[in-house]
Amino acid sequence: MRISIVGITGYSGMELLRILLQHPQVEVVSLHASQDREAPVSELYPHLKGICDLKIEAFDSQEIMRRADLVFFATSSGVAKDLSKDFVEVGFPVIDLSGDHRLPGNIYKKWYQKEPAEDHVQKKFIYGLSEFADVRGERFIANPGCYATATELALIPLLQAQAIELDSIIVDAKSGLTGAGKNPAASSHFVHVHDNYVTYKLNQHQHIPEIVQQLQRFDESLQQIQFSTSLIPLNRGIVATVYSKLKEPLTQEELTAIYQECYQEKPFVRIQATLPSLHQVVGTNYTDIGFDYNHVTNILTVVAVLDNLIKGAAGQAVQNMNLMLGFPETDGLLSQPSYV
């Protein structure tokens, strides 16, 4: 399977290349980005010298379709919706890591403050939360966001079990700095974020409608969630701490059974007996989930952790590719965490 990557110079694009270079069933044939000159990727990123020396090329949809069998878009929001149209029109497989095809046009425009993809194009994309989406044989996948992935994986088992009060859901999500993207900004400047803790986009984060839309698939009576996001001075990682009230008290054993039944055949979700930490998952495609119930307050706390560049982006995109093409789901994705 021949692969092209558009948006190679961003953090997710580089992580996607790293994973695909180790994949047993694919060959990366072209890399694309918006830059003034073509240059070997190893010239711009010396850690790739002798590993990948492909040139970074200007985007050309016809050339990509001539050389590749599938294209990944690891571009900023607002880019893939336009560049992917040529591929969609002829049925050429696309996996989009950005938010451009996750939401209906009117909702996308409100939350992203950008013009949406054309309606007939957006409707062809299936939302690829790998543990719950049936993407086998599909051609167009909208990869979930990093916050959305952690939050949805934490909550879906509880919705399926009808265990929680829907109007009590509060999510406190924290991200490492790569989640803010590569473009320099005052909000991610070293002096601003080092030795600091910054809450941002309170009640305004673009993953809110994505999360609500997907949770409603499991309980359509859910109306809204309370969702906050913060940056923490780490390179990688998402920690989603999810609070909700139970309809009826449950023991730790009963809660564990709910989660294990949901994820028993899902290789990249691990239910932990203790609350998880980021070191357990950084550098991997795993999501680790732990929980604790307070019988005094009737509040269940669920903690989900993942690597925002892997399970929250490039790793899940490859997981979706594997499922789409009928490859073993774990191909290219069985890296182990580096604990320290």
Curated annotation (Swiss-Prot):
Signal peptide: none annotated. Coiled coil: none annotated. Gene3D superfamilies: Dihydrodipicolinate Reductase, domain 2, NAD(P)-binding Rossmann-like Domain. It is found in: Cytoplasm. GO terms for molecular function: N-acetyl-gamma-glutamyl-phosphate reductase activity; NAD binding; NADP+ binding. The active site is at 146. GO terms for biological process: L-arginine biosynthetic process. Keywords: Amino-acid biosynthesis, Arginine biosynthesis, Cytoplasm, NADP, Oxidoreductase. It catalyses: N-acetyl-L-glutamate 5-semialdehyde + phosphate + NADP(+) = N-acetyl-L-glutamyl 5-phosphate + NADPH + H(+). Its EC number is 1.2.1.38. Pathway: Amino-acid biosynthesis; L-arginine biosynthesis; N(2)-acetyl-L-ornithine from L-glutamate: step 3/4. Pfam families: Semialdhyde_dh (PF01118), Semialdhyde_dhC_1 (PF22698). SUPFAM superfamilies: Glyceraldehyde-3-phosphate dehydrogenase-like, C-terminal domain, NAD(P)-binding Rossmann-fold domains. It is an enzyme of class 1 (oxidoreductase). The keyword Mitochondrion does not apply. SMART domains: Semialdhyde_dh (SM00859). CDD domains: AGPR_1_C (cd23934), AGPR_1_N (cd17895). Catalyzes the NADPH-dependent reduction of N-acetyl-5-glutamyl phosphate to yield N-acetyl-L-glutamate 5-semialdehyde. Belongs to the NAGSA dehydrogenase family. Type 1 subfamily. This is N-acetyl-gamma-glutamyl-phosphate reductase. It comes from Streptococcus gordonii (strain Challis / ATCC 35105 / BCRC 15272 / CH1 / DL1 / V288). The gene is argC.
